[in-house]
């Protein structure tokens, strides 16, 4: 038996889906506006390699590799990427596109990841983190928030600082400690949240991995690893254009995100 769906039903469904996309776009832009309203312009500060001498040797190597003397500090970032993503470690990869905004002096970001069926909004704005996932831009299926989410979002912001490396320079939030010739400890502290990363570097100074312990559930942390590669120069700054994100569990390493940067802009308001 052939089932014929009335044209009015099809048109109604299309209009509902279109409305969902319009509402999603509007809400995303509204949150970006809040992020920018809380962004302070620090581009008047400039990188000076002569101030690196007290840092661990591989960290000095990194900054000399990715920054040039006189480089303006980065205040804000707008980034677009494509890639592959897993909604569950037991499932296969699906295609994803992403758009993301960062502020630097105040830790903030918002990311919108879009797949064929789902849209995810991951954010940390005005000291509040959240992860929300929508089916067809309309039906909320995930609504994560709380202290574990707040910490995880700040860890994401810190790891993704490789895309705006002046944020990795020593500050009241960021400290570096020596480990060995090719690794260092990055300690981060902001208000009541503190954590550290084990950061590894290659021979030419590029950061290749950042590893920390991150909440995988509300109650349990697991090893979380970001791998960076394919460094290219943008506006005099060398950044990785390829990133892979992995959970290291008792069952082994589980890759769940592979992103390729398509566009990045600095200090645009």
Regions picked out by a protein language model, each given a short descriptive name:
Residues 133-192:
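Flexible, processing/modification-adjacent segments and terminal tails
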Residues 184-266:
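Gly/Pro-enriched, hydrophobic low-complexity segments
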Residues 28-78:
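N-terminal leader/targeting segments and the immediate start of mature chains
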Residues 99-103, 122-124, 173-179, 199, ...:
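Short, exposed beta-strand/loop patches in secreted or surface proteins that constitute
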């Amino acid at each position: 038996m052939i089932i014929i769906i009335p044209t009015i039903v099809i048109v109604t469904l299309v209009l509902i889906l279109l409305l969902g996309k319009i509402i999603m776009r509007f809400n995303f832009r509204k949150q970006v506006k809040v992020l920018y309203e809380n962004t302070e312009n620090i581009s008047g500060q400039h990188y000076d390699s002569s101030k690196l001498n007290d840092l661990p040797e591989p960290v000095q190597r990194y900054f000399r590799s990715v920054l040039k003397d006189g480089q303006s500090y980065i205040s804000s970032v707008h980034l677009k990427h494509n890639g592959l993503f897993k909604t569950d470690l037991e499932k296969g990869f699906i295609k994803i596109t992403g758009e993301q905004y960062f502020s630097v002096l105040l830790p903030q970001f918002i990311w919108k990841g879009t797949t064929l069926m789902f849209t995810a909004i991951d954010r940390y704005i005005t000291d509040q983190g959240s992860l929300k996932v929508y089916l067809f831009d309309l039906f909320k299926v995930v609504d994560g928030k709380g202290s574990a989410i707040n910490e995880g979002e700040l860890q994401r912001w810190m790891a993704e600082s490789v895309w705006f490396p002046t944020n990795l320079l020593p500050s009241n939030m960021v400290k570096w400690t020596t480990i060995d010739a090719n690794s260092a400890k990055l300690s981060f502290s902001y208000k009541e949240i503190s954590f550290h990363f084990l950061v590894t570097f290659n021979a030419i100074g590029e950061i290749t991995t950042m590893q920390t312990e991150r909440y995988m559930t509300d109650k349990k942390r697991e090893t979380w690893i970001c791998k960076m590669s394919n460094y290219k120069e943008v506006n005099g700054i060398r950044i990785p254009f390829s990133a892979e994100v992995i959970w290291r569990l008792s069952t082994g390493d589980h890759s769940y995100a592979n992103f390729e940067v398509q566009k990045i802009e600095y200090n645009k308001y």
